[in-house]
C-alpha cells in the first residue's frame, strides 16, 4: 500500500486542485491513501527547503507530492509537483480535473482561512494541556532537593496546573541530577507531567515559564570581597542572555538563597531587561527567622506572628521592622476570636531584648547562614511563588526584594526588600502604610552597601568601603523597634565550591549589555 503526501502553501490554487483530485481517488480506490500538509505562505519556502535537504530532493514550487511505502518503510519517493501528480492520476487511474482557474483561487483562499483557524484552535488547546515549564538553576544545591516535593504537591501552582520541571546544572553534576530525577518520578505526583535535566548552556530556559535561581557554587578561588562581587557578573550575564533568548515572554524569575541575593537580582535585571519587571528576590527566609525568634520569646507558634517587615539587603545590611507586627491566638489574660490580634511590641516588655538580644540572634543567623538551609530556602521560595500566582493572604504584609522606583525614599536602581502584597498575579508596594518612616541615616546605611555592591561588581568602583556614620547613635528613639542586622562577614558569603559552573559561550562576547537603567 502506498500513501501519497501532498504538501503546499495554504493559499496555493494548484494545491487546491491537487487536493481535490487526491480526495476523489482516496474515496474511490480502497488502497489509495493521502496525507495533507499545509503551511502558511510566509513559512512555506523555509519548510520546503528543510524537507528537500532532509530527503536530498530538488523541488522549488507548491505543491510537492511524494510517496511513502507503508508496508516496506524506507525513504519516501518524490513524485513531483502539480503537473506530475495530475499526469500520474490520468495515466494510472484515468482521472482528470476540469476545475476552472477562478474556482481554484476561491478554494485556495478558503484553504488559507481553514489553515489559520486550525492553527488558532491548536494553540488554544496547547494552552490548556501544555504544562507549566519550571526551571531550577544550580539544581545540585540542597534547596532544590527540598523544593521539588513542594512544587509537585500542587500547593504552589494549584492541583489543576500540570508542571514540567527541568533541573539545570553543569555536566559534573549530571549523575546527581539523574538520581534526583528518579526520586522525583517516584513521587507519582498527579501534577507532575515530566522531570528532566539540562547540562547544555545553549539549551537553558527553553520556553521557561518559571525560573528559580538558587545559590551557585563558585568555580574559582576568591580572596577579597571585591573579587567575590565581581565573580557574580559572568554567570548573571549568561543567565540574563539565555533568559532573553530562550524563555517564554512572560517568564517569572525568582532569586533565592543566602549570598548576594539583591546583587544577583539587580544583575539579572540588567542583563535581561525585557523581563526585568518579572524578576524578584525572596525575603521570606529572613522574615521566617525573625518570626521564629519572636515566637520563642512569646512562647507561641511562629505562624501566629504576622506582618514582620524586612527592609534593605536580604543577605546583608537589613532592618527587621516590628512596628506593624502582630500576634494572633496569643495565650494571655485577654482572649478574642481567631481574627483578634495584638501588637507584638506591647507584649515584649523588655525593650532591651528587642534592641540587643533579638538583633544579636538575627545577626548571628545572617553572618553564619547555618540556619538558612535547604528546608527554609525551599519553603520561602515556594511560598513566594504561591503568593505570586494566587495572591497573598488578605491584609497581610509580605516582604519582597524588588527594583526600587523611589518608594519610601529609597534610591532608584537598586533591589531593596520592602513591604508588598500580592494580587492579580503581581505585587503592589504598600506605600500607604503609616508610621513606617525610616531616618535618613539608617536608610543611607542600608542603601550605601547595595549601591557599592553594584558598582564594584560592574567595575565602576575598585574598592568596597562599608558605610561609616559620624553619629554615635544611629537609631533614633522613634526607630528603636527596627532591629538592625549587619552585613554578613565576607568569608561566610562565599559559596562552597562543588562543581564547575557552566562557562560563557563564545556568543556572549558579542552580547550587547542592555540595561534597565535610564
UniProtKB/Swiss-Prot annotation:
**Which UniProt keywords are listed?**
NAD, Oxidoreductase, Tricarboxylic acid cycle
Task: Specify the enzyme's EC class, one word.
Answer: oxidoreductase
What is this enzyme's EC? 1.1.1.-
GO BP annotation list? malate metabolic process; NADH metabolic process; oxaloacetate metabolic process; tricarboxylic acid cycle
Pfam families given in the database record: Ldh_1_C
InterPro entries assigned: Lactate/malate_DH_C, Lactate_DH/Glyco_Ohase_4_C, Malate_DH_type2, NAD(P)-bd_dom_sf
Tell whether NAD is among the UniProt keywords: yes
The record's annotation in Gene3D superfamilies points to: Lactate dehydrogenase/glycoside hydrolase, family 4, C-terminal, NAD(P)-binding Rossmann-like Domain
The record's GO molecular-function terms, alphabetically, read:
L-malate dehydrogenase (NAD+) activity
Query: Among its keywords, does the record have Transmembrane helix?
Result: no
Q: Give the similarity note.
A: Belongs to the LDH/MDH superfamily. MDH type 2 family.
Name-wise, this protein is Putative malate dehydrogenase 1B
Q: Which gene encodes it?
A: MDH1B
